[in-house]
From Swiss-Prot:
Belongs to the ZWILCH family. This is Protein zwilch homolog. Pfam families: Zwilch (PF09817). The modification Phosphoserine is found at S88. PANTHER family: PROTEIN ZWILCH HOMOLOG. The gene is ZWILCH. The keyword Chloroplast does not apply. GO terms for biological process: cell division; mitotic spindle assembly checkpoint signaling; protein localization to kinetochore. It comes from Bos taurus (Bovine). Component of the RZZ complex composed of KNTC1/ROD, ZW10 and ZWILCH; in the complex interacts directly with KNTC1/ROD. Signal peptide: none annotated.
Length: 589
């Protein structure tokens, strides 16, 4: 019996050590398999961590779970299952639940990990000194009387020796009528660890905004704004965080919210990306037009109006009127946040018309042919902003003097021409907002608007600048922060995107003073509330947490049916999840 346990501990440790060493060398691999039915994967710092909702930590750990069952090919009959059934299977998280181990098996694996690191186990065939491995966490199926969902083990070590181990136990349950007292938690902690002094630290997360779907056919953008608050000491369970707390805004914004004030500007950006992809791949997937009239009709009408104005020598005045009309059409949905530009030049107006109506390469050729012919005849003398290096701008400047280069509207030239004027227009839109709102200067924006890089890189940088705009506007709409906070947020986003690629899943974190955001949380229920009791040793702690969503992803919890709800309550009000983290210390010497 003991020889079998010793051999199992040796094999388990060897597998963990190999996984750990290969990870340090940068070798990426699949989880290693132990005894055919168990897999172990190393979660590095910064990677998605299944324990983040429990321990609020993000360190390197081993996760132990069952090997997932291979999904069999569905039979024709199974493929005909109803949509409701498919959705039900997905929502229950059944696949994740199958990964959990029985509590007896979990304790056995924790035992192997402990044995291998115990310096007194000199009979084990393990190289000495033993390498201290990251903490080990095992998914449990919650079938025991205590409902254990995780077991964990973390080493206690000095600079050169492993002196002991901390064993963790996590339980979780649906608890409509939870009853817990802070003093009882403290007494339990003192009794378990035989310590006289302790501290209680609090954490609360408030959901300030979360986007929702318009209907079943339009998915919501994944935009969330939450507020994390930490403080110490804690006076009572579910205490409202005091104004002396430490607070951080967490902001994740996905561009393109269909109901958002930037939806039109985002559509222009998407059209710009279509053109850029077309240049890069040779294939252009034209979007559906917004206009009833064709692009050629719209451009011809636009040129006719300018031509008539030119005959009366009053093109500047009429241009301004047309600009204001177009600006209202293009930017009307964001005029509460973006200063409506009344200075769109000829090229920018042309972009507005063509980006909403062009549906083919032939449209591009015909539209630019009409423009060039009007310039060659002198029928129009449009004005332009200074600073543009686009091909169309050069032709317009040449037309002022009656001599124009010959341009062959073939190959990629028409796409490049429209892409250039779109880039110029969007850059000016963003500059107008950030400078108008006093959130950035031209120097701050130089990286994003510089024409010194190739066209594809310019498009990529403009896309990043648009995401910054979406982040700032979302905060302006939903949390209405002071200008100082908006300025700090803008600068933080600018700094991040000067050094990183576009990532709409990135969570921007901004420290804030609780006094500046107190109206957002003091009368609200937290999405998550946690108290952590410890005795001066970080690893020796007791944690109690209340949340409105399951903190454990591999267990299925009974949820009330919608029929259980009354007019006076909501689903969120009826469901609470509580979980406890307790630990015990084992000293090897």
């Amino acid at each position: 019996m003991w020889s079998g346990a010793n051999r199992a501990a040796e094999e388990f440790y060897a597998g963990l050590l190999q996984e750990f060493d290969e990870n340090k060398k940068g070798i990426r691999k699949d989880p290693f398999i132990y005894e055919a039915d168990i897999q172990v994967q190393l979660i590095s710092k910064g990677q998605p961590n299944p324990l983040k909702n429990i321990l609020h930590e993000n360190e390197t750990i081993f996760i132990v779970e069952k090997v997932p069952l291979e999904k069999e090919e569905p039979s024709p009959i199974e493929e005909l299952q109803s949509e409701d059934t498919a959705i039900s299977d997905l929502s229950t998280g059944e696949n994740v639940g199958l990964l959990a181990l029985p509590i007896g098996r979990a304790r056995q694996l924790i035992g192997f990990y402990t044995m291998a690191h115990n310096p007194n186990m000199t009979h084990l065939k393990i190289n000495r000194p033993v390498t201290a491995l990251p903490p080990l966490w095992v998914r449990c199926d919650g079938s025991d009387p205590e409902g254990i969902s995780w077991l964990g083990a973390e080493l206690i070590s000095t600079s050169s020796n492993i002196t002991g181990i901390v064993l963790y136990m996590v339980t979780c349950k649906v608890d409509k009528n939870y009853s817990v007292n802070l003093e009882d938690l403290k007494k339990s902690h003192k009794k378990r660890h035989h310590l006289s002094t302790l501290t209680a630290s609090g954490f609360a997360r408030y959901e300030l905004f979360k986007s929702t779907a318009l209907d079943d056919t339009v998915a919501a953008s994944q935009t969330t704004i939450t507020l994390d608050i930490s403080w110490s000491p804690v006076d009572e369970i579910l205490q409202t965080p005091p104004l002396s707390s430490t607070a951080t805004l967490n902001i994740k914004v996905e561009s393109g919210e269909p109901r958002g004030p930037l939806s039109q500007l985002h559509r222009e950006l998407k059209f710009l990306l279509v053109l850029a992809d077309g240049l890069r791949t040779g294939v252009t997937e034209w979007p559906e037009p917004l206009e009833a009239k064709s692009a050629v009709e719209l451009v011809q009408e636009f040129l006719n109006e300018l031509s008539k104005l030119n005959e009366f020598g009053d093109s500047t005045k009429k241009d301004t009127e047309i600009v204001k009309h177009d600006a209202a059409a293009v930017d009307g949905s964001i005029e509460c946040l973006l200063t409506v530009r009344g200075d769109l030049d000829f090229a920018e107006q042309l972009w507005c018309k063509m980006s909403s109506s062009v549906i083919s390469y032939q449209d591009l050729v015909k539209c630019f042919s009409l423009v060039i012919q009007s310039l060659q005849r002198g029928a129009i003398q449009p004005w332009l902003h200074s600073g543009s290096n686009s091909l169309l701008s050069k032709l317009i400047h040449q037309s002022y003097y009656g001599t124009m280069d010959t341009v062959s509207l073939s190959g990629t030239v028409p796409v490049q021409m429209l892409l250039e004027i779109g880039l110029d227009k969007l850059k000016k839109d963003y500059i107008c907002f950030f400078i108008g709102q006093e959130l950035a200067s031209l120097n701050h924006l130089e990286y994003f608007i510089s024409p010194s890089v190739d066209t594809q890189e310019q498009v990529h940088r403009v896309q990043k600048l648009h995401h910054i705009l979406e982040i700032v506007v979302s905060c302006m709409l939903f949390i209405k922060p002071q200008h100082e906070l908006l300025f700090s947020l803008t600068q933080s986003c600018i700094k991040y995107y000067e050094q990183n690629p576009l990532d709409e899943q990135h969570i921007f974190q901004l420290p804030v003073r609780p006094t500046a955001v107190k109206d957002l949380y003091q009368n609200e229920k937290p999405q998550k509330w946690r108290v952590e009791i410890n005795s001066g040793q970080k690893k020796v702690k007791t944690v109690w947490q209340l949340s409105d969503s399951p903190p454990i992803d591999h267990l299925n919890f009974h949820r009330p049916d919608f029929s259980e709800l009354t007019l006076s309550g909501s689903l969120e009000e009826r469901i609470s999840f509580t979980n406890m983290v307790t630990c015990s210390q084992v000293h090897f010497k």
